[in-house]
């Protein structure tokens, strides 16, 4: 028994030594396996997507298109309020999305803008698009961020020419529409006839069978209700929000390395220029090295300094943004609208954004009248050229050419409204021109 006990103790000691030796190997092996499975560096071929490390969020990206004064901005205001975007202490005004002075004065949307709401644990990114054809350059690029569209139509006027223009762009991109017939509280309105006109318009624009099988919502954004029957007003606009969740598809998350296209930009006096766009593949995180692929194919190495997503009307800093979401990126130098943010080691560019050519031109020159310098502070040709160059960075539908005179520039735009807004903006900023 004593000999058996001694032999057992020697065996136990040997087992302990073997286990101790294997322990270090096991830790290293398991660590390598975990890295392989989850691929922390984002962009490899692990067994599971790296996004499993984060809470995946259900997202809907929807653009709202409408003719001028059909109630689009008012509807967005109601959606923001319905989703309790504002705290009890905040004073909620009107025309929240039209925060540009000229937009409020003229009652039109000039610049495409982004906001988001949360409803039933779903994040809905709202893309507000201009309704006037002169601002089609804004429309064409921001529609690429959407997976569906709300087609807002006046119950009395029906679909108008500008509705046709924007809707044709949305249908060509394969976006599925939800038709919202607004202002059913108007006297002598004909909602059923308007719905038939919308169907005829879509058929004329070569909509697919799936696009023609659209859902219709009736209501009054001003009164704050939406429902399936215009004769029976509801209490709120939740019927519309439920339809968005049900019929607008979730963003497709294709396999592969990072791809994000810059579709608009913002500016902050603290961080400079901010790139805004949608992530089509993989994900982004703060500090991640990336490649910026330019329109001409040139590749610039860079790194993400800050990431922001939209929460209501504001931007919120985050550490990580998943595929399908719309975000703002800080830290990129020399980017342009249409550039692709992609993986640093395996850069893959997205197709460039196509914008229709300008249709008219206007001569911009210095003020050489007797009242030179009386109203503005930027009066030289250099000032005017620098301002036009700045506008070219964000206004894709604009084109500027030099003339034989150093004091005159030929500016091409999409229409009278397009160029008139630019002139008025420059005048208010202190530029003198004629």
Residue positions per predicted region:
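Short intrinsically disordered, low-complexity coil segments enriched in acidic
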Residues: 1-5, 434
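Polybasic, lysine-rich low-complexity intrinsically disordered segments
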Residues: 2, 17-18
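Residue-identity detector for glycine
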Residues: 11, 43-46
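Structural and coupling elements of P-loop NTPases
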Residues: 30-31, 35-41, 48-434
């Amino acid at each position: 028994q004593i000999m058996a006990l001694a032999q057992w103790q020697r065996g136990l000691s040997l087992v302990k030594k073997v286990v101790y030796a294997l322990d270090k190997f096991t830790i290293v092996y398991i660590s390598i396996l975990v890295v392989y499975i989850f691929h922390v560096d984002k962009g490899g071929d692990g067994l599971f997507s790296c996004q499993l490390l984060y809470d995946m969020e259900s997202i809907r990206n929807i653009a709202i298109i409408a003719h001028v004064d059909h109630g689009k901005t008012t509807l967005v205001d109601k959606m923001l309020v319905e989703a309790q975007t504002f705290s009890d202490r905040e004073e909620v005004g009107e025309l929240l999305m039209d925060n540009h002075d000229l937009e409020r004065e003229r009652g039109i949307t000039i610049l495409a803008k982004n906001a988001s709401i949360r409803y039933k644990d779903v994040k809905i990114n709202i893309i507000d698009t201009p309704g006037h054809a002169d601002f089609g350059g804004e429309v064409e690029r921001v529609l690429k961020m959407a997976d569906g569209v709300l087609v807002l139509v006046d119950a009395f006027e029906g679909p108008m020419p500008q509705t046709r223009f924007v809707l044709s762009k949305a249908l060509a991109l394969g976006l599925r529409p939800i038709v919202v017939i607004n202002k059913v509280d108007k006297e002598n309105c004909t909602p059923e006839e308007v719905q038939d006109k919308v169907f005829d318009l879509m058929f004329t624009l070569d909509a697919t069978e799936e696009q023609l099988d659209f859902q219709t919502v009736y209501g009054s954004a001003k009164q704050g209700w939406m429902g399936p029957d215009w004769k029976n007003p509801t209490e709120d606009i939740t019927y519309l929000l439920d339809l968005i969740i049900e019929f607008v598809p979730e963003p497709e998350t294709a396999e592969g390395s990072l791809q994000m296209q810059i579709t608009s930009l913002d500016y902050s006096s603290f961080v400079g220029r901010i790139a805004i766009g949608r992530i089509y593949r993989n994900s982004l995180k703060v500090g991640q090295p990336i490649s910026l692929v330019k329109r001409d194919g040139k590749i610039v190495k860079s790194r993400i300094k800050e990431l922001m997503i939209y929460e209501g009307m504001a931007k919120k800093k985050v550490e990580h943004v998943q595929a399908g979401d719309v975000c703002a990126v800080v830290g990129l130098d020399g980017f342009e609208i249409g550039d692709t943010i992609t993986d640093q080691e395996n850069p893959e560019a997205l197709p460039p954004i196509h914008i229709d050519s300008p249709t008219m031109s206007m001569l911009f020159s210095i003020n050489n009248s007797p009242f030179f310098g009386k109203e503005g502070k930027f009066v030289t040709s250099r000032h005017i050229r620098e301002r036009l160059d700045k506008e070219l960075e964000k206004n894709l539908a604009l084109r500027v050419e030099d003339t034989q005179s150093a004091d005159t520039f030929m500016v091409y735009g999409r229409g009278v409204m397009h160029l008139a807004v630019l002139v008025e903006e420059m005048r208010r900023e202190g530029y003198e021109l004629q």
